[in-house]
Regions:
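Catalytic core of Fe(II)/2-oxoglutarate
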Residues: 190-251
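Catalytic core of non-heme Fe(II) oxygenases with the double-stranded beta-helix
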Residues: 131-205, 248
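Signature of the catalytic double-stranded beta-helix
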Residues: 72-131
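Generic detector of solvent-exposed, compositionally biased contiguous segments
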Residues: 1-17, 128-136, 140, 202-217, ...
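N-terminal auxiliary "cap/dimerization" subdomain that precedes the catalytic jelly-roll/cupin core
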Residues: 1-86, 90-95
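Residue-level detector of short, conserved catalytic/binding motifs and their immediate flanks
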Residues: 24, 156-158, 162, 214, ...
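Short, Φ-rich (hydrophobic/aromatic) sequence segments
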Residues: 41-44, 160-163, 237-241
């Protein structure tokens, strides 16, 4: 459980506390400047492959769950190899948030890289999310839904987002001081990824406002949601945390 409800600045100790679920989130201020975010917005909206799993979100890139778990592992890695050159060009004309974050993590002493799957190659890592609506209460935790994938061996999972375009109202991040357990699945809404709000009833929650150019990292095994918002654009991925302290990024 959390020691407090504070959002800590990025450091090796704060990231360790987040992995251990002792704090709600970590913030990296001024991760990218306005020129960089504007360039990335333009490139993503004009050139990125668009996929969508729910009405409220247009994904600029692919998802291991949607294109992998719900279709096949072969399909996901085939798409990943197809999109790698496309996103390399996007980053060449703007910048790569994924590689910048990996560099920041390495400077803090973490063994960080793109996740790979034995016999399949590297995962796709980093996609945009154009949000029009809200995100209901849910978790993102590979051991819950991806048993046959290497990411299921992680002891913890983080999610990070770089906020590119943030409207004046809405789009707050809600995080609860409760981590998913198998028994919670009785609250999962049939045929959907999200949960009835009863799963977090009477649980401590923090509400985070976000700003363009900053990164928020959370423990994605914790229940979280996003409040109603129009035309918000973010970019990020997951980070699997393994027993040997390796951090591996994937989407």
């Amino acid at each position: 459980m959390w020691e407090n409800g504070n959002i800590d600045v990025f450091s090796s100790s704060s990231l360790g506390a987040l992995i251990e679920n002792r704090i709600p989130a970590v913030r990296i201020e001024a991760f990218a400047d306005a020129n960089e975010t504007d360039a990335l917005i333009t490139e993503l909206l004009e050139h990125a492959c668009r996929t969508s799993s729910i009405e409220q979100v247009t994904r600029l890139g692919i998802s291991q769950y949607e294109q992998g778990v719900r279709v096949s592992k072969d399909n996901y890695f085939k798409l990943a190899r197809h999109l790698d050159p496309e996103f390399a060009q996007i980053y060449a004309r703007s910048f790569s948030p994924v590689q910048r974050l990996i560099g920041r993590l390495k400077k803090k002493g973490f063994d960080s890289a793109i996740m790979s799957e034995p016999g399949m190659g590297d995962y796709f890592a980093g996609n945009g999310k154009l949000r029009n609506g809200y995100s209901p209460v849910h978790v993102d935790f590979a051991p819950q839904d991806s048993a046959s994938w290497a990411i299921a061996k992680a002891r913890a999972q983080l999610a990070w987002n770089l906020y590119l375009r943030v409207p004046a109202k809405g789009g707050e991040l809600l995080v609860w001081d409760k981590q998913w357990q198998p028994a919670d699945d009785r609250h999962q809404v049939d045929g959907n990824y999200y949960y009835d709000e009863a799963v977090v009833r009477d649980t401590r929650m923090v509400r985070l406002s976000v700003s363009p150019g900053e990164v928020i990292i959370l423990n994605s095994r914790n229940y979280h949601a996003v409040s109603e918002v129009r035309d918000r654009l973010a970019f990020g991925s997951f980070i699997s945390v393994f027993e040997d302290t390796r951090l591996r990024l994937w989407s």
